[in-house]
């Protein structure tokens, strides 16, 4: 098995840093699932905890070369400590390139090379050898995208910066936030304690076409669907977002799950936050 990749775009390097940092906050162990056309981030969190599923298409990388377990099963699953990955790329924001390679340093390693400009015409390389476990095929089933049945409502999110500021303020008041949305493009956030209730209203957000189809099935578009989630877990989803997504979607499974989808060009992030 072989894997080599290189990112030279500053914005994609920043997003790689951001995803790695978020994964480290959600799970101690992460699996990088390497496929011929994309790279997946698969945090191995506990059942019932918030989860993230990240996906980077091959076009994100200036160079991408891999050979999987076999021609039939052309994938590689690398298990590593999430914190190790986050630390290795933490200071790569000003790097001219970020290289990833599966190597053998007495044991399998994911070698990260951060190339930094030291003076005009010269670069210096910071190398990190992260121990990894190459998962056998019988474990690949644990690295698949989380399955979510059809949501009860889908609505486009407001500007993430606005939403993050609102969630931060609410986190200082209460530990949980009630998220509501309907098929008329409305979304509400509510935090409530014995002494105070704070509620934010968003309207005219719009709904994706498949959600609007529910209206033709006799469903009242004004009916609000809700889920109550941990404020800190919701805030983690917006932490560090430096690149605005081209599409941001909120899916709610009534009183069960908050599912957020952020898409930016060839990168997509999904957050799964269970009700609490």
From Swiss-Prot:
Name the UniProt record assigns to this protein: Checkpoint protein HUS1B
InterPro entries, per the entry: Cell_cycle_HUS1, Hus1/Mec3
Summary of subunit composition and partner proteins: Interacts with RAD1 and RAD9B.
Disulfide connectivity? Answer: none
- Name any Gene Ontology BP term: DNA damage checkpoint signaling
- Please give the coiled-coil regions recorded for this protein: none
A cellular component term from Gene Ontology for this protein is: checkpoint clamp complex
**Per its UniProt entry, which superkingdom is the organism in?**
Eukaryota
A Pfam family the protein falls into: Hus1
Protein family per UniProt: Belongs to the HUS1 family.
